[in-house]
Amino acid sequence: MKIAIIQFGGTNCDMDVLHVLKDVVGVDAETVWYKEENLTGFDGVVVPGGFSYGDYLRAGAIAARTPIMDSVKKIAAEGKPVLGICNGFQVLTEARLLAGALTTNEYPKFRCHWTNLRVETADTPFTSKFRKGEVIRMPIAHMEGKFYAEESTLAELDENEQVVFRYVDEKGRVTDEANPNGSLENIAGILNASRNILGLMPHPERASESILGSDDGRKVFESMADYITENF
């Protein structure tokens, strides 16, 4: 098993993801520069956080049009798991691999703090280690994290259980106060229709060791590794 971690100009969470995958979860992983056009030999992909290309035009817009993304789309078409974290989520929406868009936070300022999330479904390659309804903790760090989609798209995401994480309070309740950025329906992470692509704004790699304040995020990577082992 080998997982690719995509690097763009401005990516800054790649080494954190590499550390978690290799040293915490114990799987083989390798960083791959955006100019590469071949991901042969990889069984999964992580598009990590950062500020790719300075967030010019829109967050993730330039990165979504780099050569490596054609290979990411091919990996996804093969059913292999693709995980987009923060800026990676933005890249995946810009690449039309995920529905909706990430826009400027409702209160236009950079938000960097811990959030409570509710696991909406455990039936995914990324959440099999969780329980449905479980409340977990992960930090956010973004300026453009407000999830937006048309009403019909939101209804489809709900109907097909493609919403994976929602921002909630400590008791697991969906409230306006628990929503850090104004995301519609408190959405923090979603799947594609085929359920092998996940994008989320919170950072699981920053919550993968107890010394950091939470190790809940580790289960995202462990679930992904289990899925690859069982299917590829």
Swiss-Prot record:
Keywords: ATP-binding, Cytoplasm, Glutamine amidotransferase, Hydrolase, Ligase, Nucleotide-binding, Purine biosynthesis
Glutamine amidotransferase type-1 domain boundaries: 2-232
Active site: 86 (nucleophile), 203, 205
Pathway of action: Purine metabolism; IMP biosynthesis via de novo pathway; 5-amino-1-(5-phospho-D-ribosyl)imidazole from N(2)-formyl-N(1)-(5-phospho-D-ribosyl)glycinamide: step 1/2
PROSITE patterns (UniProt xref): GATASE_TYPE_1
EC number: 6.3.5.3, 3.5.1.2
Xref: InterPro entries: Class_I_gatase-like, PRibForGlyAmidine_synth_PurQ
GO BP terms, alphabetized: 'de novo' IMP biosynthetic process
GO molecular function: ATP binding; glutaminase activity; phosphoribosylformylglycinamidine synthase activity
Catalytic reaction(s) noted: N(2)-formyl-N(1)-(5-phospho-beta-D-ribosyl)glycinamide + L-glutamine + ATP + H2O = 2-formamido-N(1)-(5-O-phospho-beta-D-ribosyl)acetamidine + L-glutamate + ADP + phosphate + H(+); L-glutamine + H2O = L-glutamate + NH4(+)
Listed GO CC annotations: cytoplasm
Role according to the record: Part of the phosphoribosylformylglycinamidine synthase complex involved in the purines biosynthetic pathway. Catalyzes the ATP-dependent conversion of formylglycinamide ribonucleotide (FGAR) and glutamine to yield formylglycinamidine ribonucleotide (FGAM) and glutamate. The FGAM synthase complex is composed of three subunits. PurQ produces an ammonia molecule by converting glutamine to glutamate. PurL transfers the ammonia molecule to FGAR to form FGAM in an ATP-dependent manner.
Quaternary organization: Part of the FGAM synthase complex composed of 1 PurL, 1 PurQ and 2 PurS subunits.
NCBIfam families referenced in this protein's UniProt entry, alphabetically: FGAM_synth_I (TIGR01737), PRK03619.1 (NF002957)
Protein name from the UniProt record: Phosphoribosylformylglycinamidine synthase subunit PurQ
Species in which this protein is naturally found: Methanosarcina acetivorans (strain ATCC 35395 / DSM 2834 / JCM 12185 / C2A)
Gene (UniProt): purQ
